[in-house]
Amino acid sequence: MSIQRLGYLGFEVADVRSWRTFATTRLGMMEASASETEATFRIDSRAWRLSVSRGPADDYLFAGFEVDSEQGLQEVKESLQAHGVTVKVEGGELIAKRGVLGLISCTDPFGNRVEIYYGATELFERPFASPTGVSGFQTGDQGLGHYVLSVADVDAALAFYTKALGFQLADVIDWTIGDGLSVTLYFLYCNGRHHSFAFAKLPGSKRLHHFMLQANGMDDVGLAYDKFDAERAVVMSLGRHTNDHMISFYGATPSGFAVEYGWGAREVTRHWSVVRYDRISIWGHKFQAPA
């Protein structure tokens, strides 16, 4: 048994208030809860999908991967333990905070916290309503979206996420960033979404490179682009990726890592073949210096 989807993400941020404004007015998320020290946000019928907690890191804090049942959670726990990973069965306080029925946690080879759960809270009686009028986000069986981490050892990352957690490799991109710097990106999937997680040995001090939201319509992306562009907060221009074919742009967040906002990604198929690419984009995705 492997995990089924990316369910939620948590970030440690220096300025919760800025994130509350950013998530609602730039990304079109719906605020679910908020205080001076933390906030959560919705993008669909789930009680929350994104959490920000006050702290100095301005970086990745945790990811939550979903399974469909208690049995599935037990099977993932056994798989992790079989691969030498220490697993913690979380208690009632954190279970209540996450709004799930069962929860385990561990760390990947680089100390990144990973949570696996089942039984998330649905709020069909309180429909998602974007404050900016976003038509909706592609979630459901594909989960939240994706995120990309910088790791020190790609072989160790590949072993942990594919063998212990059950991800499958979608493809690889050898990306020449510039000035002779080249990195290899690994893209992993666990459902129809082309990738829910990716990693590479990237330059820079942050663990989180970016996270991605997939909107239901291209106009949603264009309207979001205009908001970022007006604030000179576009990091990479509109473009279309070679591997998942998503049309997207990248914007700056209040914490220094990026958010990818896209539409139109293709899905993995039953007879998917792993391939490699020499470029990240068919067109576009030109670097821009945010203000």
UniProtKB/Swiss-Prot annotation:
Catalytic activity as recorded in UniProt: 3-methylcatechol + O2 = 2-hydroxy-6-oxo-2,4-heptadienoate + H(+)
Pathway: Xenobiotic degradation; toluene degradation
PROSITE patterns, per database record: EXTRADIOL_DIOXYGENAS, VOC
Single GO MF descriptor: dioxygenase activity
Matches recorded under CDD domains: BphC1-RGP6_C_like, BphC1-RGP6_N_like
Signal peptide: none
Alphabetical list of SUPFAM superfamilies matching this protein: Glyoxalase/Bleomycin resistance protein/Dihydroxybiphenyl dioxygenase
One GO BP annotation of this record: toluene catabolic process
Domain of life per record: Bacteria
Quaternary structure annotation from Swiss-Prot or TrEMBL: Homooctamer.
Protein name (database record): 3-methylcatechol 2,3-dioxygenase
Organism: Pseudomonas putida (strain ATCC 700007 / DSM 6899 / JCM 31910 / BCRC 17059 / LMG 24140 / F1)
Gene that encodes the chain: todE
